[in-house]
C-alpha cells in the first residue's frame, strides 16, 4: 500500500473535516469520535498524552532531519502570517513546521509491519498474494465473500463473520458498483 512508498509523513487531517463528515450524517466520524482510535493504534515517540497514544501498532517518530534553510523558511513564513505549528496532529494542521514521520529507528514503518505481520499468526486469516478482486459475493444485503482472480483462475473466499473492503479510494467503490451496490442510476448506466 501507500505506506510503503509515500513520504512517511504522519498527519491525521483537520478536525473540521471529520466533524463535517459527522454533520453530513456519518455518525461516529467526528474528530472526537475517531481520536480514540488514533490514540489506540499510535506508538508516539514522546509517549501517551491527550493527543497521542503509546504502545500501539503505528510507530510515530520525530524527524531526524534539521536543516538551517528549513528553519529559515519557517521564520520567513511568519512574515506572511503562517505561524509555526509544533504538532500537526492536534486537529488543526495549518501552519509551518516539521512533520512527524512513520519510522522506527529511522527506518520506514508501514501498515504491513504494524498491522499485517502480527496478524498473520491468526488462524482466521489467510493472506492471498498476486490476486485481483473482481467482485463481492452477496447473500441478500450482506457481503458474504469476494471473488478474485489469481494465476488466470477465478476463486472465491467466503467469510464467516464479516468482509472488510479496503481496496482504496477508487477500487472500493468500483468493486461495490460491480457487485450491484450503489446508486441505481449509476448501476443502470453501467449495465449492472
Language model segments and positions:
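Flexible glycine/proline-enriched surface loops and loop-helix/loop-strand junctions
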Residues: 2-4, 15-22, 54-59, 156, ...
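Short, solvent-exposed loop/turn and secondary-structure capping segments
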Residues: 2, 8, 47-49, 138, ...
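Conserved redox-cofactor binding core of oxidoreductases
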Residues: 22-143, 149
Amino acid at each position: 500500500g501507500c505506506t510503503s512508498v509515500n513520504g512517511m509523513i504522519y498527519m491525521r487531517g483537520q478536525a473540521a473535516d471529520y466533524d463535517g463528515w459527522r454533520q453530513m450524517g456519518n455518525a461516529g466520524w467526528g474528530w472526537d469520535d475517531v481520536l480514540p482510535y488514533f490514540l489506540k493504534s499510535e506508538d508516539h515517540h514522546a509517549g501517551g498524552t491527550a493527543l497521542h497514544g503509546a504502545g500501539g501498532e503505528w510507530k510515530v517518530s520525530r524527524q531526524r532531519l534539521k536543516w538551517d534553510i528549513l528553519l529559515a523558511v519557517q521564520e520567513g513564513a511568519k512574515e506572511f502570517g503562517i505561524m509555526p505549528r509544533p504538532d500537526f496532529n492536534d486537529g488543526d494542521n495549518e501552519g509551518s513546521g516539521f512533520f512527524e514521520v512513520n519510522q522506527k529507528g529511522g527506518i520506514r514503518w508501514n501498515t504491513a509491519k504494524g498491522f499485517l505481520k502480527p496478524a498473520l499468526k491468526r488462524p482466521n486469516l489467510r493472506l492471498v498474494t498476486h490476486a485481483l478482486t473482481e467482485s463481492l459475493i452477496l447473500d441478500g444485503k450482506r457481503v458474504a465473500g469476494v471473488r478474485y482472480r489469481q494465476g488466470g483462475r477465478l476463486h472465491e473466499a467466503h467469510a464467516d463473520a464479516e468482509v472488510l473492503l479496503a481496496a482504496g479510494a477508487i477500487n472500493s467503490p468500483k468493486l461495490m458498483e460491480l457487485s450491484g451496490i450503489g446508486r441505481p442510476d449509476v448501476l443502470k448506466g453501467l449495465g449492472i
